[in-house]
């Protein structure tokens, strides 16, 4: 499994790029959004990748973030959504937009992707709505982008640190923080997100981050 490619951008096509990794060129299919973010040929680039295997075809699909890759993988679990349709949805909405549309049951936004009809858009929302909050939590903790590494340098040994005596935050604080981070990543104002998460946490103090996100989204829906 090829999970990440880092090298020099050699060529940009209409729906793919060619990345030179120490003399070996890899064709990586990307969304319109990812293609627009690519640097000029000759510059360093890195993409998280998913290898899609068919009976007579092997294709690499590339993503600038790990959360985008995970959303693509999840979209392909829906009947009627292949690798290219998943890329079209991500290209039209981005990972945050997909998470928002699915969480709010907004099939019309999913349908805005080229080649995605109303039946498939509705199926995406219905089948993935319960899974969206978990990926949203991951999005709040995942690194922003894949870093291009052309040459590796040896690392110096890290200095020893004294054991921390600071107490770890309680689990509830971690859950509310993760939920707040996920909602702000979706574009909600921090004050609105904090108020919704606080209310959701008060209604269900034992809720984990995914449950808090689901409850907060219901509270925020009338404002969007």
Swiss-Prot record:
Main location: cytoplasm
Keyword DNA-binding part of the UniProt annotation: yes
UniProt key word Zinc: no
Residue ranges, annotated region (Domain II): 65-143
Keywords: Cytoplasm, DNA damage, DNA recombination, DNA repair, DNA-binding
GO molecular function: ATP binding; four-way junction DNA binding; four-way junction helicase activity
Cellular location(s): Cytoplasm
Region described as Domain III: spans on this chain: 171-224
Gene3D superfamilies xref list: 5' to 3' exonuclease, C-terminal subdomain, DNA helicase RuvA subunit, C-terminal domain, Nucleic acid-binding proteins
InterPro entries documented for this protein: DNA_helicase_Holl-junc_RuvA_I, Hlx-hairpin-Hlx_DNA-bd_motif, NA-bd_OB-fold, RuvA, RuvA_2-like, RuvA_C, RuvA_C_sf
GO process annotations (BP): DNA recombination; DNA repair
Intrachain S-S bonds: none
Transmembrane regions: none
Region (Disordered) residue spans: 150-181
Renumbered residue ranges of the record's region Flexible linker: 144-170
Domain comment (free text): Has three domains with a flexible linker between the domains II and III and assumes an 'L' shape. Domain III is highly mobile and contacts RuvB.
Cited HAMAP family: DNA_HJ_migration_RuvA
Protein family per UniProt: Belongs to the RuvA family.
Subunit structure: Homotetramer. Forms an RuvA(8)-RuvB(12)-Holliday junction (HJ) complex. HJ DNA is sandwiched between 2 RuvA tetramers; dsDNA enters through RuvA and exits via RuvB. An RuvB hexamer assembles on each DNA strand where it exits the tetramer. Each RuvB hexamer is contacted by two RuvA subunits (via domain III) on 2 adjacent RuvB subunits; this complex drives branch migration. In the full resolvosome a probable DNA-RuvA(4)-RuvB(12)-RuvC(2) complex forms which resolves the HJ.
Protein name (record): Holliday junction branch migration complex subunit RuvA
Designated gene of the protein: ruvA
């Amino acid at each position: 499994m090829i999970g990440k490619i880092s090298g020099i951008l050699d060529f940009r096509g209409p729906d793919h790029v060619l990345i030179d990794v120490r003399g070996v060129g890899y064709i990586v299919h990307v969304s319109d959004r990812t293609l627009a973010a690519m640097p000029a040929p000759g510059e360093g680039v890195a993409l998280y990748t998913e290898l899609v295997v068919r009976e007579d075809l092997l294709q690499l699909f590339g993503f600038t973030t790990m959360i985008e890759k995970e959303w693509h993988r999840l979209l392909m679990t829906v009947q009627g959504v292949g690798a290219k349709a998943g890329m079209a949805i991500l290209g039209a909405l981005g990972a945050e937009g997909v998470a928002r549309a699915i969480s709010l049951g907004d099939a019309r936004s999913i349908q805005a992707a080229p080649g995605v009809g109303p039946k498939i858009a509705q199926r995406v929302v219905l089948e993935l709505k319960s899974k969206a909050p978990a990926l949203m939590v991951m999005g709040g903790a995942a690194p922003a982008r894949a870093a291009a590494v052309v040459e590796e340098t040896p690392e110096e040994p890290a200095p020893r640190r004294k054991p921390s005596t600071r107490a770890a935050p309680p689990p509830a604080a971690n859950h509310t923080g993760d939920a707040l981070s996920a909602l702000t990543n979706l574009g909600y104002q921090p004050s609105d997100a904090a108020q919704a998460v606080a209310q959701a946490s008060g209604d269900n103090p034992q809720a984990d981050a995914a449950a808090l996100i689901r409850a907060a989204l219901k509270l925020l829906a009338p404002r969007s």
